[in-house]
Regions:
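Helix-loop-helix hairpin linking two adjacent transmembrane segments in secondary transporters
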Residues: 135-181
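A late C-terminal transmembrane helix in Major Facilitator Superfamily
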Residues: 323-360
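Intracellular juxtamembrane helix-capping segments at the cytosolic ends
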Residues: 111-124, 313-327
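Conserved MFS/SLC helix-loop-helix module at the cytosolic interface between two early adjacent transmembrane helices
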Residues: 57-94
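Cytoplasmic helix-loop-helix junction between adjacent transmembrane helices
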Residues: 95, 101-139
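Helix-to-loop junctions at the C-terminal end of transmembrane segments
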Residues: 58-70, 261-273, 357
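Paired small-residue
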Residues: 85, 96-104, 298-306
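Extracytoplasmic gate region of multi-pass secondary transporters
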Residues: 210-252
Length: 388
């Protein structure tokens, strides 16, 4: 029972890693609310992706923070900042104050971001590690889907009520303090002799380039998923396909598909191997094209479910690939670099959508552009894999 609760508590750290986009169902009402104050929709959309910029800043400071502070203190501080930054706009909805609170939310998520993933590799090895990484990806998606669904229900009260979802951070904090030990004993026993016997080998430029390519891949997948999360509620309401609550339901189902992919993750890795990377973006592109051509809520939902399935699969595969190919001495650095790519993709979502707006006539055309880029990348990866 103790081991089970330890696993649950470790997985719970991932429940709110992408919670910054959970309030997306409230975007249409937020645009109306701040529009009355003369604030454009672009600036309102920025509030949703804004925490990602703070996350990037924290990740850049991660090596220094890890040397100065203990892992436990960093995680506890992160969960406290996450909860406070998420809750604050309930008290005051002034744009500038909400802007600051979203940055605080990002600081909190950034502090636990890399550790929620690397801690799995510290506590587990072999097939159990692969299984836990798959479950971690599912936990991340489950948290996002659950929070997005709850936000949609709270939207019937007011858009600011959706921020109540960040109270989950306090529950996760309690689980972590109660059930997660400070340092696995087996890691202590292994690391001490290594430090005496040999100095850590530097990260080669070739290996660094490999890590950066994985970071770009993961960032691209997350850019598309984040853009979908921002754009689906707008498309549903503007085109009269449904209500904001129905858009919230689609987003929740889209994210829940990630749980299904996480469940089959280890089996899919065994079947497709390295070809899984190209397959993910090819299917992602197909789903985006379905969303672009959709003239009903049902068809839009089918495309969203397709993208939701492969999104989590692609990101989880990148982290698994890193844990398999990168030495443990450099694992935290590699994880941090990939997370930088992931959060850069998420942070740029609203900016990229704004860029697309300069040469497109409608919000749904972003799906077509992303779809074409995804299929192009998938073909390049497939050809590279086939002829290398």
């Amino acid at each position: 029972m103790k081991i089970l609760m330890e696993k649950i508590s470790l997985l719970a750290l991932s429940l709110m890693l992408v919670s910054t986009y959970a309030i997306s169902p409230a975007l249409p009402e937020m645009i109306i609310y701040y529009g009355r104050q003369g604030i454009s929709s672009d600036w309102v959309e920025l509030l949703v992706s804004l925490p990602s910029f703070a996350i990037i800043g924290v990740l850049l400071l991660t090596p220094w923070l890890s040397r100065v502070f203990s892992e436990r203190l960093i995680i506890v501080s992160g969960l406290c900042l996450l909860s406070f930054g998420g809750f604050f706009p309930l008290v005051n909805q002034t744009y500038s104050l909400v802007f600051v609170s979203r940055l605080i939310l990002g600081l909190g998520i950034g502090l636990i971001n890399a550790r929620a993933i690397s801690i799995i590799s510290q506590f587990f090895t072999g097939r159990e590690r692969i299984k836990m990484l798959g479950l971690r990806g599912s936990a991340e998606v489950l948290g996002s889907a659950f929070l997005t669904f709850i936000a949609g229900q709270l939207l019937t009260i007011s858009w600011s009520a959706t921020l109540l979802i960040y109270g989950l951070g306090l529950a996760i904090l309690a689980l972590y303090l109660l059930f997660v030990p400070q340092v696995p004993k087996k890691v202590q026993v292994q690391e001490q002799p290594l430090k005496k016997q040999a100095k850590p080998e530097p990260l080669t430029s070739r290996r660094l380039l490999y890590i950066l390519s994985l970071a770009l891949y993961a960032g691209f997948v997350i850019l598309i998923n984040s853009a979908n999360t921002l754009r689906i509620p707008v498309v549903v309401t503007q085109f009269g396909l449904g209500t904001a609550q129905q858009a919230s339901f689609i987003l929740s189902l889209m994210m829940l598909m990630g749980i299904l992919s996480g469940t089959f993750f280890s089996s899919l890795v065994e079947i497709f191997g390295r070809s899984l990377m190209s397959l993910v973006v090819l299917v992602l592109g197909a789903g985006l094209l379905v969303m672009w051509l959709a003239h009903s809520l049902l068809v839009l939902g089918i495309g969203a479910l397709l993208t939701g399935f492969v999104y989590s699969l692609g990101v989880t595969y990148v982290f698994n690939l890193i844990s398999e190919t990168i030495h443990k001495r450099h694992l935290h650095t590699a994880t941090t670099l990939v997370l930088l790519g992931c959060n850069l993709g998420g942070a740029c979502a609203s900016l990229v959508l704004r860029l697309f707006g300069f040469f497109t006539s409608g919000p749904a055309e972003a799906f077509a552009i992303f779809g074409g880029l995804s299929i192009g990348l998938g073909l390049v990866l497939w050809l590279k894999r086939r002829f290398s």
